[in-house]
Amino acid sequence: MAKFLSQDQINEYKECFSLYDKQQRGKIKATDLLTVMRCLGASPTPGEAQRHLQTHRIDRNGELDFSTFLTIMHMQIKQEDPKKEILLAMLMADKEKKGYIMASELRSKLMQLGEKLTHKEVEDLFREAGIEPNGKVKYDEFIQKLTIPVRDY
């Protein structure tokens, strides 16, 4: 697993895993899997967490060790692709498949659907992504700007 995850990630995962390893036996309860994964920034649904457990033949009342947990986290992270999720959301809004969405329509969707953004949050997002208030937002450019890795100073 070390070839897929950095040592820093493994250390962070171990620290969080240890908080839920109440009896300090190197295991967490299967019922805690979803919580631990979310604490580490993953976004599994309850169904996804259950499928991970089933893949490893772990009963809902069972336990999993750290090695299994690392494998599960790796699989979850691999399937969570923000670029793909953003593209799918934009394609749903683009009924005519033009390859772009009007900024006004994107603003409306961001403020009304899902985890609603405020007007200021949308304005900040548009400013950072270089989107004109009444312009066209091309998917590929928008996704590229949104998913640029943040520099670690």
Curated annotation (Swiss-Prot):
Report disulfide bridges, numbered on this chain: none
Q: Name one GO molecular function term.
A: calcium ion binding
User: Which Pfam families does the annotation name?
Assistant: EF-hand_7 (PF13499)
Q: Which InterPro entries match?
A: CALM/Myosin/TropC-like (IPR050230), EF-hand-dom_pair (IPR011992), EF_hand_dom (IPR002048)
Q: Which GO terms describe its cellular component?
A: cytoplasm; microvillus
Matching entries from SUPFAM superfamilies are given as: EF-hand
All residue ranges annotated as the EF-hand domain in the record: 8-43, 44-79, 81-116, 117-152
| Superkingdom of the source species | Eukaryota
CDD domains recorded: EFh
Main location (coarse class)? other
Instruction: Enumerate the Gene Ontology biological process terms.
Output: brush border assembly; microtubule cytoskeleton organization
Keywords (alphabetical) are: Cell projection, Repeat
Q: What does this protein do?
A: As part of the intermicrovillar adhesion complex/IMAC plays a role in epithelial brush border differentiation, controlling microvilli organization and length. Acts as a light chain for MYO7B and is required for efficient targeting of the IMAC to the tips of border brush microvilli.
* Quaternary data: Interacts with MYO7B; the interaction mediates the association of CALML4 with the IMAC/intermicrovillar adhesion complex. Interacts with MYO7A.
Query: What is this protein identified as?
Result: Calmodulin-like protein 4
Give the organism the record lists. Answer: Bos taurus (Bovine)
